């Protein structure tokens, strides 16, 4: 494939971003969980809204005579049920986040299926650009090589920009909340001081009247 003039101009930038993007934005991660015979293990991630989440999970059974099964539940920050499976050895869940916050995936071993041994689970958790099926995109749009890599990097840069905006909005929200809290604390302090002054004045008047009645002053 011949490189066009535009592609030649973009290549140095793409080459630089190829090293910067993995550092600046998480692209996905594999998680290993050791689930005890009784109890629950969970993984979570702070994700903004309108982000694609894709995850595969699989039981790794090496020292079990019978393949154990697990139950899985995925919930949103507001407690909405996004994925719920029982008595499975593997599975997948995918969704687009509707709200910003902490998304939680919990796993627990089904009773009498594990022989009182820990159950090992491998979880491939991907979000944002890492969840895209680039092979299908390349096939559908007939792109390959450097052009495909540039498309990936453009998506990564866009994701970074969205993350920066999300962090700025969170910072602004936290600043507003902090200012409101400081204002409330200031008013509470003023009110407390006013109450103390009023109580002190009442005590002075009461003692003055008491001493006058006793003819001590």
From Swiss-Prot:
Residues modified as Omega-N-methylated arginine are 170, 175
- Note whether Ribosomal protein occurs among the keywords: no
Write down any Gene Ontology CC term: endoplasmic reticulum membrane
Motif COPII vesicle coat-binding per record, residues: 210-211
* Ranges of the Cytoplasmic topological domain: 206-217
The UniProt transmembrane annotation reads 185-205
Q: Does the keyword Coiled coil apply?
A: yes
Q: Sorted alphabetically, which InterPro entries does this protein's record hold?
A: Emp24-like, GOLD_dom
Q: What is this protein called?
A: Transmembrane emp24 domain-containing protein p24delta3
């Amino acid at each position: 494939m011949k490189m066009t003039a535009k592609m030649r101009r973009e290549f140095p930038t793409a080459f630089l971003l190829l090293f910067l993007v993995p550092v600046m934005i998480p692209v996905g991660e594999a998680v290993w969980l050791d689930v005890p015979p009784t109890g629950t293990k969970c993984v979570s991630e702070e994700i903004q809204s309108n982000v694609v989440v894709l995850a595969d999970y699989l039981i790794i059974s090496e020292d079990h005579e019978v393949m154990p099964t697990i139950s899985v539940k995925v919930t949103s920050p507001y407690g909405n049920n996004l994925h719920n499976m029982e008595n499975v050895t593997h599975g997948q869940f995918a969704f687009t986040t509707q709200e910003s916050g902490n998304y939680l995936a919990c796993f627990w071993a089904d009773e009498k299926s594990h022989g009182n041994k820990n159950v090992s689970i491998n979880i491939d958790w991907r979000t944002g650009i890492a969840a895209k099926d680039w092979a299908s995109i390349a096939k559908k749009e007939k792109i390959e090589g450097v052009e495909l890599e540039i498309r990936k990097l453009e998506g990564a840069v866009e994701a970074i920009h969205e993350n920066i905006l999300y962090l700025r909005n969170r910072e602004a929200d936290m600043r507003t909340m902090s200012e409101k809290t400081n204002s409330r604390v200031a008013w509470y302090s003023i009110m407390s001081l006013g109450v103390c002054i009023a109580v002190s004045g009442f005590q002075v008047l009461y003692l003055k009247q008491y001493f006058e009645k006793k003819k001590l002053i």
